[in-house]
Amino acid sequence: MAMNKTKKLTTVAMLFALAIVLSFAESMVMPMFALPPGVKLGLGNVVVMYCMVYLGYSSAFQVTLLKGFFSFLTRGFTAGVLSTMGGLFSITIMFILIKLLKDKVNYYTLSVFGALFHNLGQLAGISIMFANTAPLAYLPVLTVSAVVMGLVTGATLKVVIPALKRL
């Protein structure tokens, strides 16, 4: 069933707020774990995946840009660029996977590839910003973390889908 414009706008706004709250909560909890620099769970991206699967690319794009802008406002230029680049790479691969694989794609596949491409987008952003390819040396660490964290966020999405569908 299609949503009217007002309901879709308010749903996207609530999902953006939820993504910000999840990201903030994650930033409070994750420092308790001894993880390599730059490795995060990405709970806010669970919301973006939900948008992609249930509301479409446009809504996922809107939430991604809003998250990037919020990062820019609260953490500065570099964080805003990295959030936006990672998010755009991530939703692009998810869109491609959904279009190519249709019903064969699952939350775990979307999440792992989304995490991998999020990391690639951030590495591309930092390499462009500093005109240096040295950050690419961190790719093996980020690849392993993307697979692990992607599986966790995929499982998280699967668990929270019933609650999110009620929005």
Predicted regions and their residues:
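Interfacial aromatic-anchored transmembrane helix boundaries in multi-pass membrane proteins
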Residues: S23-G42, L66-M94, Y107, M129, ...
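Generic transmembrane alpha-helix motif of multi-pass integral membrane proteins
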Residues: L43-Y57, I93-I98
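Active-site-flanking alpha-helical
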Residues: C51, T74, G125
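Short helix-perturbing small/polar motifs within transmembrane alpha-helices
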Residues: M14-F16, V21, V63, T84-F117
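Hydrophobic transmembrane alpha-helices
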Residues: A2-Y50
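Membrane-embedded alpha-helical hairpins and interfacial helices in multi-pass inner-membrane proteins
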Residues: P37, F77-T84, L100-L167
